[in-house]
């Protein structure tokens, strides 16, 4: 009897000092052959920072606000995930080869691992940053349900790993700072999750201006409604329920969980919060970025 290899929850692999999901680390070699196009648009975030949200917004912009066109395929087909390489599924590179221009491309890669072609071609980047306390809580629940990640362990032990940058994609602190620095020399629209929650229409307008497009007022209002967390959570084309259960088990925790700012307060203890704040102050010293941990 043939033994079926268990491909779930392998340990992280380090590439240039950055820990990554094993399968994604294996994709980085082939990714060197990736050819960016000047009309590509890169959506980059640290995980759990609003990637799917801004991906849906941008696809709706590209489709002129037509929701039916946006429901043509799941979000991960419409906006291919550059470094994805899950067993038995098409890699990001394979999906991108079949994606007609202009392409929207999703990635969580830090600059050290990003294919140079994206910078050489001056590809526009929409970057979204979210306050790290909510990121840590969301990432913990994502680890519980997404089987390509190592087991998260207890919340307390996961939080320690997060602060030390010993989770997939490494340090949140380094990620948000290096993309902030890049925005001075490269076409990067740097957005904040909390600003998008506070006033989505204002932030969508910024995105429209950045990509050189415009939409009528009523289309904008329609987009705000249909890219809301409530709508996206129940839409199979955005909520990741089309992913095989062996990869994502929504019965453990849904991919789209709460989608709010300040939910960390239901999880962090007073002691954890004090420790986190002290660590944050040290790691973000001298950085001009400021985050709102609640609205």
Swiss-Prot record:
The catalytic residues are 108 (proton acceptor)
**Keyword Transmembrane annotated:** no
Effect caused by changing residue 290 to T: A 2-fold increase in KM for serotonin
The protein's job, in short, is:
Sulfotransferase that utilizes 3'-phospho-5'-adenylyl sulfate (PAPS) as sulfonate donor to catalyze the sulfate conjugation of phenolic monoamines (neurotransmitters such as dopamine, (R)-adrenaline/epinephrine, (R)-noradrenaline/norepinephrine and serotonin) and phenolic and catechol drugs. Catalyzes the sulfation of T4 (L-thyroxine/3,5,3',5'-tetraiodothyronine), T3 (3,5,3'-triiodothyronine), rT3 (3,3',5'-triiodothyronine) and 3,3'-T2 (3,3'-diiodothyronine), with a substrate preference of 3,3'-T2 > rT3 > T3 > T4.
- Naturally occurring in which organism (per UniProt): Homo sapiens (Human)
- Per UniProt, dopamine binds at 86, 106-108, 146
InterPro entries associated with the record: P-loop_NTPase, Sulfotransferase_dom
Q: What is this protein called?
A: Sulfotransferase 1A3
State any single GO MF term: sulfotransferase activity
For the keyword Chloroplast, the answer is no
The effect annotated for residue 101 to H is:
Decreases levels of sulfotransferase activity; 2-fold increase in KM for dopamine
Q: How does it assemble?
A: Homodimer.
Similarity remark: Belongs to the sulfotransferase 1 family.
Residues annotated to bind 3'-phosphoadenylyl sulfate:
48-53, 130, 138, 193, 227-232, 257-259
Q: What is one process in the GO biological process aspect for this record?
A: 3'-phosphoadenosine 5'-phosphosulfate metabolic process
Q: Could you say which EC number(s) this protein's record lists?
A: 2.8.2.1
């Amino acid at each position: 009897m043939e033994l079926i290899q268990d491909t779930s929850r392998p340990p992280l692999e380090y590439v240039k000092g950055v820990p990554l999901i094993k399968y994604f680390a294996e994709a980085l070699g082939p990714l060197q052959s990736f050819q960016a196009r000047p009309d590509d648009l890169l959506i980059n975030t640290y995980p759990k920072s609003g990637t799917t949200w801004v991906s849906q917004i941008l696809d709706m912009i590209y489709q002129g606000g037509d929701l039916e066109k946006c429901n043509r395929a799941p979000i991960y087909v419409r906006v291919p995930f550059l470094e994805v390489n899950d067993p038995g599924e098409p890699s990001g590179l394979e999906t991108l080869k079949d994606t007609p221009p202009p392409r929207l491309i999703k990635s969580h890669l830090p600059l050290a691992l990003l294919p140079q072609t994206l910078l050489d071609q001056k590809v526009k980047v929409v970057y979204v940053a979210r306050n790290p306390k909510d990121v840590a809580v969301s990432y913990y629940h994502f680890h519980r349900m997404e089987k390509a990640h190592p087991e998260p362990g207890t919340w307390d032990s996961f939080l320690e790993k997060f602060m030390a940058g010993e989770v997939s994609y490494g340090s949140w602190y380094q990620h948000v700072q290096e993309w902030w620095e890049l925005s001075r020399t490269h076409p990067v629209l740097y957005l904040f999750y909390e600003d998008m929650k506070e006033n989505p229409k204002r932030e969508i307008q910024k995105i429209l201006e950045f990509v050189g497009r415009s939409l009528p007022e009523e289309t904008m209002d329609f987009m705000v409604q249909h890219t809301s967390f409530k709508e996206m959570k129940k839409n199979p084309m955005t909520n990741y329920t089309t992913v095989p259960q062996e990869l994502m088990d929504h019965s453990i925790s849904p991919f789209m969980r709460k989608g709010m700012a300040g939910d960390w307060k239901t999880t962090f203890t007073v002691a954890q919060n004090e420790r986190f704040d002290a660590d944050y102050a040290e790691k973000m010293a001298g950085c001009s970025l400021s985050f709102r941990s609640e609205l």
